[in-house]
Amino acid sequence: MSIRVLTGITTSGTPHLGNYVGAIRPAIRAAGAPGTESFYFLADLHSLIKVQDPERTQRSTLEIAATWLACGLDPEKVWLYRQSDVPEITELMWLLTCVAGKGILNRAHAYKAVVDKNRSHGDDDDAGITAGLFMYPVLMAADILLFNAHQVPVGRDQIQHIEMARDFAQRFNHIYGGEYLVLPEAAIDEQVATLPGLDGRKMSKSYGNTMPLFCTREELKKYVFSIVTDSRAPGEPKEAVGSAVFQLYQAFAGVEECSMFAQALVEGLGWGEAKVRLFERIDAEVAPLRERYEDFMRRPADIEAMLRDSAGRLRERDAIPLLARLREAVGLRSLSLCMVSAVPVPQEKVALPVLKQYREQDGRFYFKLIDGQGAVLVQSRGFASPRDAGQWIALFKQVVSAEALVSPMLEPVADPVVVLAALRRLREAGLDLYT
């Protein structure tokens, strides 16, 4: 069993160095970590909320896909797919829409921000607001829940969307009486790197101070030399801390190189020479990526084929089976199977198995699966925290094969067939699977 981690990739705009350092590079380094199954999707349906230029939408999707591939995302090791290639996402969105509370959507940060802006201008609350913007959190929830993601890396400003996804999943599970949807967790990286822009403020498209990731070598040099610095002349000591030039250098150089660069500034290195060193350091890392990016951009058909193939395999493995189960749960069933029920024959009640989570005297947390007569079917090994144990329980609930019962975190299972039957009974009963 592995932890599923899902990352959405915005497909609007041109990637800049801030995107690369703060999001792309760390995400790719984390991809394919042991015990992790990584999902990356191009959020082209989301982009339609803001962008209604079809040529721009198409071009941007290609550029973003080429960017991530050029930076090292390996589609042989992770899942990379386009949102619009998985129609089950929008079908799940509708099922979630039918259980989502409007009051929760009213409190969505993005929607509230536009409402507040309209009010400050004396306009109607919903002036210029589309249903797409209002329903954005439900689409995001469908992205996450369709593939039973356990963790979603987000910034603190996105935590609300994960909480909404959890709420919608809980409502659905409660209404239809089963553990159909896994409740995701927000994975917050407190060390997300932010780069200064050309003017010293945070690099952001809204400030117009970005440096495109894959501009030409000559253009990159012009951008670097346009970074704002103080007026201290060559020979005068300069402070590295707070300098945009030094902060950018830190993002691309090792600790020893940064220490030498900082010392050179203190000893009077001129800003012109400092920018030359910065440019050479950035270009050393970006140049090979730029070549790969240009190669991918010359082969859009290959990218299209890869995205479609990945989406097709994911649909077959995960999306289609889950939607079939959800359709059955909500009653979207074949009418040929609809029969008038006969008078039910009373049956002897058989106690259901149960999952128990508990803490031992060693301070560690455990769980076990017990049958209706109290016999232990599965015993876990110890976990450091209740959260770790809970995440494994969430994975264990979905086990459908004997191979998945072989894990270093589980004691050897004596009879996998009995265990799988017990889990299946619990799922069919639609009960909470642990106490």
Curated annotation (Swiss-Prot):
GO terms for molecular function: ATP binding; tryptophan-tRNA ligase activity. Pfam families: tRNA-synt_1b. It is an enzyme of class 6 (ligase). Keywords: Aminoacyl-tRNA synthetase, ATP-binding, Cytoplasm, Ligase, Nucleotide-binding, Protein biosynthesis. Its EC number is 6.1.1.2. A motif ('KMSKS' region) lies at residues 202-206. It catalyses: tRNA(Trp) + L-tryptophan + ATP = L-tryptophyl-tRNA(Trp) + AMP + diphosphate + H(+). ATP binds at T10, T11, S12, G18, N19, G155, R156, D157, L195, K202, M203, S204, K205, S206. It is found in: Cytoplasm. Its main location: cytoplasm. GO terms for biological process: tryptophanyl-tRNA aminoacylation. A motif ('HIGH' region) lies at residues 11-19. InterPro entries: aa-tRNA-synth_Ic (IPR002305), Rossmann-like_a/b/a_fold (IPR014729), Trp-tRNA-ligase (IPR002306), Trp-tRNA-ligase_bac-type (IPR024109), Trp-tRNA_synthetase (IPR050203), YegP-like_sf (IPR036913). L-tryptophan binds at D143. GO terms for cellular component: cytosol. Homodimer. Catalyzes the attachment of tryptophan to tRNA(Trp). Belongs to the class-I aminoacyl-tRNA synthetase family. This is Tryptophan--tRNA ligase. The lineage of its organism: Bacteria, Pseudomonadati, Pseudomonadota, Gammaproteobacteria, Lysobacterales.
